[in-house]
Amino acid sequence: MRIDRIAIAIKDAIEKRCFLPALAMSLIIPDICAKYDYPDIYYKKSKYKGHSGQGAAYAKWYDENIGNYDIDPITGIGILDGRSCWKLRCEFLHSGSIDLDDFMSVADKHITFKLISSQFSDLNYTIGGCSSVRYSKDKKNQDIELDIVNLCGKILAVLEESYLKDERFICETENKELNYIEYN
């Protein structure tokens, strides 16, 4: 299957305001790219932040391509890191859930994670709507609101600007059979 068809499908879903299918498709892109970029971690031959395997490779890919740069301008806090994005992927694709509150919370701080969409959740507004991190007045609680289209747009931007311009990546990923045929 041509990997660019996944990008087209995500954009089509967003255009039709079908954000959950767009999110599901977007969350598989880091899997594909991480397997290509970090095969040693993916196949458990080396580690990233003490972990190995598919999740560790996914987390490293997300951190290096998005997470390390996706900082809330007001609080200076990262919106989503690689481990949390991997957890979001697993919860959403395997359980139909986005409950990351317990996973993201630490001993002295409760974090509430929400996926959002708005009238500005559209790829025509650059990369999508607004995401934010807010603290409670006592700084013990934190709300993270992640715009679905914003996340999808960032993942798509990395795919389109890096990987879809890499002939070796295209050959390796398109060499796999998906047995998908579109009849018109």
Regions of interest found by a model, annotated:
Residues 15-18, 34-38, 93, 97, ...:
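Hydrophobic/aromatic-lined pockets within catalytic cores
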Residues 165-184:
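Sequence termini and other peripheral, non-core segments
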Residues 19-26, 30, 82-85:
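Short runs of predominantly hydrophobic/aromatic residues within well-ordered alpha helices
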Residues 1-4, 8, 52, 56, ...:
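Generic alpha-helical secondary structure signal
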Residues 1-23:
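Charged alpha-helical initiation segments
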Residues 28-79:
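Flexible secondary-structure boundary motifs
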Residues 60-169:
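Long, charged low-complexity segments
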